[in-house]
């Protein structure tokens, strides 16, 4: 009898593997959510509704800081084999008013969220309520392509950040000496990369002329520096005599 069982060991293992897959697939989402909610709760989103199955699910969420995007609808597809590892992988698609996201995400046991093959779209109108507080306005849309990187939800560390940013161009308004200046911004492109342990975005015209540089550091501080050439692109003049590569504005702030 023992020999018969040993001879059929592969069939036993296959049956056990199949049983585990069926068990996981039929597990109610509300049961799984109890374990996932603490990690998801660290993200700046509010999950309102879940549906579907563990493999193929739907969700509705809101971003408190971007209420103008309304309720965002989402779908996910979970990789079955990744469930047997310490970091399940999911393909996530989100869509709201003027906002879209599509990419692969992996969450490991140490609460590290890794993004790959990520793209996103944002209509500038979604940012209007935030910008109005500083009497600033912008029209057009932003696109992120081929974005990847990791972010630890526990200690807020990050790394391996890379990708491309594109702004369509459009009308902008901002304050200069307490006066509102209106201008038209041309299309610009940005490269996202790691410089040491710092994430950096370099924004330039389509011809490659550098305009703006932004960064985020591991200690949670981020900043932006603007060259005088940026005002030239907007058709504005800088009152002081300065070379076009001179940084005329620089600010840093705690962002993480």
Describe the residue ranges of each PLM region.
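Short helix-loop boundary/capping segments
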Residues: 153-193
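N-terminal beta-strand/beta-hairpin edge segment
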Residues: 45-136, 147-149
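Short, surface-exposed beta-strand/loop "edge" segments at domain boundaries and coil↔beta transitions
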Residues: 66-71, 94-103, 121-129, 171-177, ...
């Amino acid at each position: 009898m023992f020999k018969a069982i040993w001879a059929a060991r592969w069939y036993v293992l296959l049956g056990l593997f199949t049983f585990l897959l069926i068990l996981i697939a039929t597990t109610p989402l509300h049961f799984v959510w109890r374990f996932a909610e603490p990690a998801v709760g660290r993200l700046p989103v509010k999950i309102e509704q879940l549906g579907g199955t563990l493999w193929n699910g739907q969700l509705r969420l809101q971003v408190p800081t971007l209420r103008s995007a309304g309720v965002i609808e989402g779908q996910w597809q979970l990789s079955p084999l990744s469930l047997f590892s310490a970091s399940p992988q999911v393909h996530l698609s989100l869509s709201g008013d003027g906002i879209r996201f599509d990419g692969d995400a992996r969450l490991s046991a140490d609460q590290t969220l890794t993004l790959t093959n990520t793209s996103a779209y944002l209509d500038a109108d979604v940012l209007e309520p935030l910008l109005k507080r500083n009497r600033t306005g912008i029209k057009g849309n932003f696109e992120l392509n081929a974005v990847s990187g990791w972010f630890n939800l526990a200690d807020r560390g990050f790394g391996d950040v890379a990708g491309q940013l594109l702004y369509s161009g459009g009308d902008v308004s901002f304050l200069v000496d307490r006066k509102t200046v209106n201008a038209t911004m041309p299309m610009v492109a940005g490269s996202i990369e790691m410089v040491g342990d710092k994430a950096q975005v370099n924004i330039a015209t389509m011809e490659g002329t550098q305009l703006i540089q932004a960064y985020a550091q591991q200690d949670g501080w981020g900043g932006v520096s603007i060259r005088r050439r940026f005002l030239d692109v907007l058709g504005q003049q800088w009152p002081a005599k300065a070379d076009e590569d001179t940084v005329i504005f620089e600010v840093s702030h705690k962002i993480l």
